[in-house]
């Protein structure tokens, strides 16, 4: 019996030693340090796009739009290694149409409308998604690069009620 206990104890110690030895591993960590991309010009940091005055009668059906109002994001001091940029617009999506910015709530706010952001080719920009079909926009290093966009009102319902139109969005840049 004593002999069996010694063998059992020897086996247990051997297993413990084996499991401690099998825990050795190596983790390799790597990465790259890249040039800084571009600087957003001060006139593109915080600005307002004035969608002008529009009559509620301009929106007779769902999907009717106001005239597009152009705006731009200017990038300067682009490094030599920066060849392109993707831009994502982020904001609260309209409940009726998630491609539109929801109007800020308030007592005098218009209803039945959202704000649509359009790219340089007048195509709607998908909100809150940097990689949703976004194309790389070529950049010229060491020059000002102007990224043209537009914004317009778009009806989300057949009936539009007049009032104030306000919404906020931020933009995110990804450089290549």
From Swiss-Prot:
One of its GO terms (biological process) is cell adhesion involved in single-species biofilm formation. Keywords: Disulfide bond, Fimbrium, Signal. It is found in: Fimbrium. Residues 1-22 form the signal peptide. InterPro entries: Adhesion_dom_fimbrial, Adhesion_dom_fimbrial_sf, Adhesion_dom_sf, Bact_Fimbrial_Adh_Pro. Its main location: other. GO terms for cellular component: pilus. The keyword Signal applies. Disulfide bonds join 38-78. Belongs to the fimbrial protein family. PANTHER family: FIMBRIAL SUBUNIT ELFA-RELATED, PROTEIN FIMF. This is Uncharacterized fimbrial-like protein YdeS. It comes from Escherichia coli (strain K12). The gene is ydeS.
């Amino acid at each position: 019996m004593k002999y069996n206990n010694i063998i059992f104890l020897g086996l247990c110690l051997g297993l413990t030693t084996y499991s401690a030895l099998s825990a050795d591993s190596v983790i390799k960590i790597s990465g790259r340090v890249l040039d800084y991309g571009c600087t957003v010009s001060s006139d593109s940091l915080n600005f307002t796009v004035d969608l002008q005055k529009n009559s509620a009668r301009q929106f007779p059906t769902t999907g009717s739009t106001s005239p597009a109002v152009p705006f731009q994001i200017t990038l300067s001091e682009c490094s030599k290694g920066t060849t392109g940029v993707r831009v994502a617009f982020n904001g609260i999506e309209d409940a009726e149409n998630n491609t539109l910015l929801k109007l800020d709530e308030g007592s005098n706010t218009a209803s039945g409308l959202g704000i649509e952001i359009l790219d340089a080719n007048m195509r709607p920009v998908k909100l809150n998604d940097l990689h949703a079909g976004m194309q790389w926009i070529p950049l010229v290093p060491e020059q000002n690069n102007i990224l043209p966009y537009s914004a317009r009102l778009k009806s989300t319902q057949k009936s539009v009620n007049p009032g104030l139109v306000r919404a906020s969005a931020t933009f995110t840049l990804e450089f290549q």
